[in-house]
A protein has these predicted regions:
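Long, charged, low-complexity intrinsically disordered regions
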Residues: 1-97
């Protein structure tokens, strides 16, 4: 690959919100799993995943990943102040060692 084609990874700060706008459904499973793992590592006990309202494809993938993840204590669609049905709030089981 020539120097002009090299893509450098970008370090993105992890907060309590993951915005999936612009990502393809095929990318979402891995993104959600990595995000939840990072939240656990950083001690972020709860957060929100913005999947958009659309036809629900990303929402279904996000909810499926949250259901499968043993570190997830609970999750629900956002309320009126946190994105409504275009976002999902979650709580993690924090390891208090």
């Amino acid at each position: 690959m020539s120097e002009g084609n090299t893509v450098e990874p970008v370090q993105v700060p992890i907060t309590g919100t993951l915005d999936l706008h612009g990502f393809l459904p095929a990318e979402v499973k891995e993104l959600v799993d990595e995000y939840l793992s990072t939240c656990l590592e950083m001690g972020i006990p709860q957060g929100r995943i913005i999947h958009g309202k659309g036809i629900g494809t990303l929402r279904e993938i996000v909810h499926s990943q949250l259901r499968k993840n043993p570190s997830v204590q609970s999750f629900a669609l956002g309320d009126g102040n946190s994105g409504g049905w275009g976002a999902t709030s979650f709580a993690l089981k924090m390891n208090n060692d």
